[in-house]
Amino acid sequence: MYKLFFRLVFKRMDPEQAHYLAFRWIRLAARIPVLRTFVAAALAPRFKELRTEAFGLRMHGPFGLAAGFDKNAVAVDGMSMLGFDHVEIGTVTGEPQPGNPKKRLFRLVPDRALINRMGFNNEGSAAVAARLAAREAVFRTVVGVNIGKTKVVPEEEAADDYVKSTERLARHADYLVVNVSSPNTPGLRNLQATEALRPLLSAVREAADRTVTERRVPLLVKIAPDLADDDIDAVADLAVELGLDGIIATNTTIAREGLGLKSEPTLVKETGGLSGAPLKARSLEVLSRLYARVGDRITLVGVGGIENAEDAWQRILAGATLVQGYSAFIYEGPFWGRAIHKGLAARLRTSPYATLADAVGADVRKSA
C-alpha cells in the first residue's frame, strides 16, 4: 500500500515537501496515546534475541535511524514507534542556520537513492537542547546527538563551535557523534585529516566530561566513504588512541562514477551527497576495513545503502554492532523497521551464531 501511495502521491511532490508532510503525520500519530500504542504494537516488534548493548547502552535491537531525518529532535518517540531501536537526531550546529538554498533534495528513484545538499539546516544547539530537556519520553529509546560545524564559523575555529554544541547538548544525549564528513558544508571534510581531527575530538571529549560529571557520554565520529584506505586506517588508529567509543561508517558520497546509476543524467549531476542503494558496496568495504583494524576495541556503526534485513546482517558480519538507515525508509515506508527486525531475527536463528554479538565481525575474522 505504501509503495502505491509513494508512486501516486509522494513521487509527484517536491521531496522536501513530502518529507515534512510525512514527518507531520508521524508526529501527530505519536501524540495520540491509543494510536501510538496500536502503531508501535504493529510496527515495532521486540525480539529477545536481537537485544543489543553498545558503548554501555542497552537497546531493543541493533537497528536505528541515521542522522538527517529528525534534525531538531521533534519526533524521537514517533520514530521509535515505527521500530527504530535508537534515533540519531541532527546534525545540530552551534548556531541556528537555514541550510543551503532550495531545491536541495533529489530522489533518484530508479537507483533507490537520494542526493541532498541540505547544508545542516537546523534550529541550533540551544533550541534543540531545550527541546530535549523538556521531552517527556514515551518509549525507552536511545537518543544519539549528531553535531556539526556552523557554516559561517571559520575552519580554524571549528573546535570552539563543536564545544559550544557539546556543552549544550551532552547532558541530553545518550551518545554524541562528531560529524566531520558531510560534503555540504565547505571545508568540513578537511577536519577528517588526523592533524585537525585529533584536537577537535579531544576538545569535544573534554567538554563532554566537564559538562556531564555523573556519567561518561559515549563519543563517536562519523566518516565519509570517499576517504582513501590509508586515511581510514589513520582515523581508526586515532579513535583507538583517543579512546573513542565508536565510528560510524559511512556518510554520503560525492562520487558518481562506478556506481551504475540509472537515473536521468541531470539528476545524477546534482551537487550534494549521494545516499541509498548505490552506496552499499563502498560502505560495506569501509566497515570491513575498520573492523580489521580495530576489532572489538571500538564499536562500529554501519550505515549507507542498507535496504533490507540481509543488508543489515551483512553489516553485522562485517563488524557493525549497530546498523542505521534513512534513504530506504523513504522508499519502503513505515513497515520498513518491522521487516528489518523480523528478517534479522530469522537470519540469526538459521545462523551458526548463538547471539547477535557472536556474529559481529565474523566474516572479517574468517578472512583474517
UniProtKB/Swiss-Prot annotation:
Active-site residues (renumbered): 182
Alphabetical UniProt keywords: Cell membrane, Flavoprotein, FMN, Membrane, Oxidoreductase, Pyrimidine biosynthesis
Cofactor: FMN
Annotated residues for binding of FMN: 67-71, 91, 146, 179, 222, 250, 276, 305, 326-327
Main location: membrane
Enzyme class, broadest EC rank: oxidoreductase
Function comment: Catalyzes the conversion of dihydroorotate to orotate with quinone as electron acceptor.
Protein name: Dihydroorotate dehydrogenase (quinone)
